[in-house]
């Protein structure tokens, strides 16, 4: 009996080790911490690097490991959606630790459009409200439900996911990602705001040139600023 128990414990430890190794997204740190010198690149900028120069340890303070920016919502867009991304650029203590966060607030009826993080898995915790949340796997199967306060959902790395507030109050979600530079690509902007050939888009979606033009005006940052 003791031998079986010992075997199970060893197997469990090995499984945990393999899972942790497999899920690791960023390089392991080679020191206790590396508080970066001030930078300006946002956490979802693909140019953001873990190879940032570190402060001298004599300059590091407790405040480098404390972040208060999730207490309040970010600035709401016209569509009723607000985010507060949290990475090494505004929470220095996260640098080299392979993790980042985001607070998302959705007014009733508003959405976080389909998007994905190419370099990270995300775990979303619904702090307040009722939110229809889910993701789509590589077989185009949707896994979605209406989440209640206190529930969590995981969005596997690289899979498209989304949220919509189906409640009567502003919903708040806090997400954790296993990379300090997870990246983000919003599907509407990727398709219609990146400059893909219009003829290709017409054939892919069965839309007219006029319809494609309307969508590009909405999602292309250059064209939207001209109108």
Swiss-Prot record:
Alphabetized InterPro entries for the sequence: Cupin_1, Germin, RmlC-like_jellyroll, RmlC_Cupin_sf
GO MF annotation list: manganese ion binding
Domain of life: Eukaryota
Predominant subcellular localization, coarse grouping: secreted
Domain Cupin type-1: 68-213
Location in the cell: Secreted, Extracellular space, Apoplast
Stretch forming the signal peptide: 1-24
UniProt keyword annotations, A-Z: Apoplast, Disulfide bond, Glycoprotein, Manganese, Metal-binding, Secreted, Signal
Record: residues binding Mn(2+): 115, 117, 122, 161
Gene Ontology terms: cellular component: apoplast
Record-annotated membrane-spanning stretches: none
Paired cysteines (S-S): 34-54
Glycosylation sites: 56, 75
Family per similarity comment: Belongs to the germin family.
Function: May play a role in plant defense. Probably has no oxalate oxidase activity even if the active site is conserved.
Subunit composition and interactions: Oligomer (believed to be a pentamer but probably hexamer).
This protein's name: Germin-like protein subfamily 3 member 2
Provenance organism: Arabidopsis thaliana (Mouse-ear cress)
